[in-house]
Every structure is written in structure tokens, then in C-alpha cells.
Amino acid sequence: MSRTRRFSGTRPGRSMAALAVVLVGLGGACQMFDQDDEPARTTPERPPGSRSEQPDATESPGAGEGIDLREAEVPDDHPIEHVVFIVKENRTYDNYFARYPGGEGTRTGQTSDGRTVELSVAPDVQEPDLGHSFFDGIIAINGGRMDGYDQILNGEDLAGYNSFTRKGIPNYWAYADNFVLGDHHFSSMYGPTFPEHLYTVGGQAADVVGNKLQTNAPGGYCDDPGETVYRFINMTKKEQNEVMRAERRVDLDTVGNFWEEVRACFDFEVIQDQLTANDISWHYYADEGSWMNALLAIKHMRFSKHWGRDITEEEQFMEDITSENLDEVTWVVPGPGVNEHPGGPSVCMGENWTVDHVNAIMRSKYWKSTVIFITWDDFGGFYDHVPPPQTDHMGLGPRSPLLVISPWAKQGFVDDTVTEPSSVLALIEEIHGLDCLTHRDCNASNLAQVFDFDQPASAPKDRKLILEERSCEGLPARISAQYEKHGDDAFRALGD
């Protein structure tokens, strides 16, 4: 099935005169270009992850002139033998770390009518869910102004203009105090969940721009021939440049006119293919049928020997740690109830899940050779004030937090290097000598800058940070009762 969609946007595009779009640069530097002018162009090192010709990137980090974010290298004698990539849901950097000392945060936000408002203290349970679709991301960014968060779904009352304090997420802040916090880590695209997760395994999303259109059940993807998604049509370079300009001026009609409806099952190369070809063990832990299970939408993975062996339910991760069966590269995708998705799940319970899993790794024999990356897949409708680079027609999207936890990570280090989820793929490729997959991971920072391999041999023992899980008292009665009765299954009906 492939139906070209001539789209009429549900939200009108804003009329904008020529204006300067500010794109953040390394170390806080900025570059500017007029929206109606053709920006400077560069060509990536390798072909893009798309059926289209390679788009021309705007003058921005990760694609800008003279910037090579992959020049940092991990030494050949590095001690990293295990990479654990934990992908949670729907938070921005400013939502979790706007108040964190030393980071690129803010206490205020900008609204579409020109006001400056104080960011309120974030609630543990955010209800209702906030808009975080592809269009919502474009609207929120508003051509780099970062003032459209009150124009997205359920954002009218400034519901997304809030941030946590240390008291609200003490253990995440403790990890930042003792390891690495990335404050210029951007989500892969404007949103939402499903295609964002595709980037975590493939450095691309097959140009998909939304979750499946059938919302009556969790994702079946390659198991369900009736499930469809919208994605960009196969575009020429000229058409991609037209789309990118339309995104900057929030012309949703023009952007949507390049979409088509296709089946939600794809067959592009993922990094697991390269790991398998090079005899590097890997495991992808995600609940079958979950909205977030990216490999369920990759045909040659879903119908392969890997399914049920290397791709299993999330809860098996803890069993494998206990039985000393951790693979070299691991993805862990928590399910509803503990993934911190707005609209029901508790951040406190989600943070406890993270602490439980990180503690298990620290107590295991693997800690001395492991790096853990924790990030959140998309912006979730929450405010963030730093304009993302526009590297192609998919994004980047607003910032999301990145925590790097390892005995070999720098201590209390705030990394201002521009990164994205493909940066984790770039590190895996650097460590194991693999080829990159798309222009995203080819050009992304490989995160080598967050490590200190000159630490003494006792570092793994000295740098364990076993944290206590918190009591999640004070939750709304409905949420508390559901969780007490059903545990992690309490929120599955809510979906993601």
C-alpha cells in the first residue's frame, strides 16, 4: 500500500516575514541565516538513510562547514566491552535539567504571543498527554524562536512550561553530579515515538513522520498488514530543500503535501546487522507489541532467528544480568508505567526503574567494562529553549537529556557537544570498527569526549554509585491504586 497524501494541515501555518533563524553552535556559538535565503550546503560522507537524494543541510552543527564531530577517537586499548542504551520517553532537557547548575538551562520560557513566563515546578504525573507529533515539533520550534509550545495539542494552558528540581528527580541529578550530562543532546526528529525509536537502531526512520494511524491496539507493525504510517515520498534534492524551508516557516500544508501512507513494515539496514556480521553479540529488550519496539517494524529482524533469542521482552534484561549473560551491545526499552511518558506514568516510578537497572549493572561483574547511555526519545511537548540544528528534512528535534554512566565517564561533566541518538551508534561503530549506516551516524559526534581513560585501574570499584529507590507517595489516588494493583502493567492500556 502506498497512497500519496495531499495534505491539508490541521493547524494553519504561520505567516512569517523574512526572519533570522538561530541555530545553536558548538560551545554556545550561533550561526544565522535569513529564512528566505538558500543556506550554505555541505555533502555528507556517506549516503543518507532515505529513499530520496541527499538533502542539503543548513548551516548548523553536525552538517556545517568545517565541522567534523567524529574527529574524537576512542583509544585502541579502551576498557569498554559493553554498551547499554536505555531509551525512555518524552522529556526535554529543560523539563528535567533546566535548573541543574552548570548546564545550559533556563528559568523562563517564551510564548507565541511574545510573553516571557516562569517555568513552574514539574509534577510527578503529567496529565493529560501533550502534543509531540512531527507537526507539533515544527510548531514548537517555530523557525528557531522556540516559542510555539503553547500552540501544540494540550499546550494552551502552558502545561509544558515546567521543569523539575533536584527534589523531583534526585537520582537523575545524582547521576549527573557523578558522571556525564549532555546538555546539547537533541532528539533525532521533530517527533513522535515510533520513528524516533527507529533512529536508535538504524540512524534513520525510513522517512516515517508519525506513529501508526490505527490506534486501537499497540504496535503490530510487520505482524499486522493493516497498520499504516505516513512518511515522506521519495524526494529530489530540490524537493527536500523546499520541505526544509517550509519547516522553518511552519508551513504545514507544504510539508504534508510530500507525505504518503504506507504499511508500517520496513527493511532497511540496522546496526544489529553489522554486529551480527562481525560476531559481536547484541540484545534488544522491548515488549512485543509495544509502540516503542523498533525491530518489530524491520522485516528481516522480525522474521529471523534473532526474534525470541536476541530480541526479547524487557523484563529479561534483569534476568540476564543476574545470570551473567550480558551481551556486548544492548538496548533496553522500558514499557508503559515506567518509561516516564506524560499522560499517566509517574516520573518517580520511572526513575526507580532506572535506578534498579543501573544498580544491577554496577553490582555485576560487567560494571568495570560498561558504559550506560540513558536518553528520552522525543520532546514530549515540554518546553526547551535551545534551537536545534536542522540537519535534514526530519530534524533535529528539541533537546532531550543524555546521561552517560560508566566508571570511565568523566566525573560531574556537562558535555556541550552537539549529539543525537545516532551518536550512540557512532560510538558503537568506533569501538567495534564498523561502517556507519547513514549520514546521521557518519557525521554525529561519537561521544569519545565524555570519557576519561586515564583514570586509575581502581576506578570501577571506586566509582560505583548504588542509589536508593524512592517512595513514590503523593501520587494521584487513581494512579497509586492502579500501580498497587497491577504494578508495571497498570498503564499498558494508556498506550504511548
Where are these regions (language model features)?
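C-terminal motif of bacterial Sec signal peptides marking the signal peptidase cleavage site
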Residues: 26-29
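N-terminal pro-sequences and low-complexity stem/linker regions of secreted or lumenal proteins
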Residues: 31-34, 38-496
